[in-house]
Amino acid sequence: MGWLRKKKKPKSDIASERGAKLLEELIECCDGKSNPIKFFSADEILKATNDFSDSNFVLRLEVPFKWYSGKNENHPMILIKKDVGWWSGLRVDRLCRDIAVSSMVSGHKNFMKLVGCCLELDYPVMVYHSVKKHYKLEISEQPWKKRMKIAEDIATALAYLHTAFPRPFVYRILSHWNILLDEDGVAKLTDFSHCVSIPEGETFVRVDRDVGLYSYFADNYVRSGLVSDKTDVFAFGIFMGHRLLLGYEYYFEHYRGEEEESEDGFDSLMKRHARNLLSTLKEDRPMEEIADSKMIEKMGQISEQERCQMKAFLKLSLRCTGPSEEVPTMVEVAKELNKIQRSLFNDSSSLSSGQTQLDSAQDISSTVVLSN
């Protein structure tokens, strides 16, 4: 009955099909004007990684990616990202989108520098230039100053995606799983497999399915599949306030065991979470009681300047998740984060209440309604 079995395609045909799809993505994303990338053979990758040996394994950020170190004649240090997930036509599309966008942004300090890829292997890989060691982001281990720096780095990366190209790119899947830290503490955003571009002259695009962490989803994204730059701003606001400052893993961690009060569980959940944060601010509770307890324990004592920074940081995160018409752009968020770090120590009196330039024009209480 062997004749009934589906004949397996030769690897050369598979690589050619993937290459054709990648060319389509390069043309769609950047009119074919991306940074040059090298196509590695399967033998080159296997030799560089010692057949993906355990000794070359570096880290695993999330399913389905594994990262390996390697080297070859032209690159003494490279990082190889291997997708070990189940392969389908949809996954090939995502891989090609990841390669295309990575090739566009690889010159920026907050992205990995793409060298090339290998499409011949059963599980295709992407190859990055790496002169420094890179680590998985473990937020619980980071002190406050480094958390602020991580926030600014990722805000800068997202702002670049939104503004550096003729058509804005929306990242969509922000989470700590997609962030690497190099040995100097510079945060780098990875995995552009779900990036979507907004057509010229438009402010949003509609997608068939939402992807990412449910607790990071903006309202319009969940209800209507509408994606705009504000989709990333909302997710970043959650990442700032809930992960970097408060140390929450997910919304559900904070509300575990509670029953929803309405049929619209998502809407109820989001509004209740916003009210919780707002009441925390209005009650003027000490930051020692609000911020990530692990971080506070390591700090020992919070200075007045650090307390002001944390309050400004939290208020900015609330602005990011506030009413759609008043949500800042990622460029504004990145600038404000830089300001919080640099000028707060020089002008603590003007920011003693944690007020930021972005929230001075509006009562913070209006952020109860999350209408992104």
From Swiss-Prot:
GO terms for molecular function: ATP binding; protein kinase activity. InterPro entries: Kinase-like_dom_sf, Prot_kinase_dom, WAK-like. GO terms for biological process: cell surface receptor signaling pathway. Residues 354-372 have a biased composition (Polar residues). Residues 348-372 are annotated as: Disordered. Residues 1-314 form the Protein kinase domain. It comes from the Eukaryota. Keywords: ATP-binding, Nucleotide-binding, Phosphoprotein. ATP binds at M1, G2, W3, L4, K38. The modification Phosphotyrosine is found at Y128, Y221. Belongs to the protein kinase superfamily. The protein kinase domain is predicted to be catalytically inactive. This is Probable inactive receptor-like protein kinase At1g65250. It comes from Arabidopsis thaliana.
